[in-house]
Amino acid sequence: ALCDGVVMGAGAGLAQHSSHIIMTEATKFAMPESSIGLFPDVGASLFLGRCPVPVARFLGLTGHIIDGASCIMLGLATAFLASQQIDELKEKLVRCKTDEIEKIIASVRTDPGFPALKHHMPVISHIFSGQATPEVMQKRAQKLLNLGANDPFVRQVVSAFAERCPMSMTVFWRLLKVADHFATADEAISLDFHLTLRMIRRPDFIEGVRSLLVDKDKAPKWVPDRL
């Protein structure tokens, strides 16, 4: 999977279930489904579940966008290269044999540089660690802000909890708790399918789509409206 640009939702799922996942400096990775009353599906509980637990919760609940270097750090990518090298890599892959793929990727990979997310790891660990429910996580984030943490990142987390669908966040939080039992992507995606059938029958899905994609007022009225 060549992830040179926006890699979100279903696109992220297609990439994460590939044998080789290539990121660039142009990569923007996220699972933003909680903004439309759904939950991170396409097996996200499996691939995000391989990240440290606080990070998996953070990415799944808030839909935060991360860069390619952060994906490398978290094990969400197998290689990093400059965006301008993508066309060269494509040409080589089209002509190569299967057993040559690793060597070809190694020949063009570059240092991803400093992961933007690394700077925020202490805050993520503080808010999203332990046995905390989404409600407790929200309170932790708000407390940091109230204590004078003049950090734009903390503000983003607080805003995400306030704006995104409470039921969606709770569903994914619970889904992560059972992710360890999944042996394959098929198992994770099968459960996602059945959960999605239930979620799209709820008013939150219609409201989320209306708010973000139709009217674009970004003022959804969730049911329930709090965690």
Name what the model sees in each region.
Residues 1-123:
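Conserved catalytic cores of soluble enzyme domains
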Residues 66-69, 84-227:
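C-terminal alpha-helix plus adjacent terminal tail
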